[in-house]
Amino acid sequence: MHDITLYGHMTVDRIFDGFEEKQTLGAMANMWRTFKHIAPDLDIGMCPTSIGEAIVYIDRDSSTRYSNFVPDIKTNTPIIKQSKISHAMYINKLLDVSWLKELTGVISADVCAGPRVDSSLLQHIDYFFIADEDAYADLKTMCKDTKGHVILHTNKSSVVSDGRYETNYKIDDSMFAPKSNVLGAGDMFASSFLYGLHLGLQIEEIQEYAHDTTSKLIRTEN
């Protein structure tokens, strides 16, 4: 049994950091890389269902990134693996989500910029990650759609709610890295959050750990 298994998109990223170009792997690879940084011995399963390509521009002055994403050059139906935590990436971009209800263990998912997520999928999700700019409704509505918790996050804060209770966390200004390469920051945050969940931490502790770890990783990679 794996500790955490990743499903969904893996991409070949062509990145322009200003005018400097490099190529790397993204999406699922971002989470894998984060796990290897924070917990090298964690047993990570990987089941890409879509392989695509992306062009990414990083604007350090505003700490933002812009991308054009062709997600489904190759697709495959995953073989579901036994796992303590199963995470589905970018479910608003997946062509086939029929396997989502078959995932094992604690089930989490996230979305990326693009079409609105099909809210009927969220009935299968224990932890749903969505960035503030991608929110399709208010937090209360998204919680009603989701089986478990919604993690609504920005680059400086997050709210975790199950519709009854919510916990809020905001990083200290000193932890924010200005003019930084924020590529993959959302994936770093989700990975760190899931690792905290794997450790059995309380939600408040997980939020603090996830934000702190993401900030440190961004500083390390810049």
Language-model segments: residues:
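Active-site glycine-centered loops adjacent to acidic/histidine catalytic or metal-binding residues
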Residues: H9, A131, G186
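Ribokinase/PfkB-type carbohydrate-kinase core domain
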Residues: H2-L6, K36, D43, A54-Y169, ...
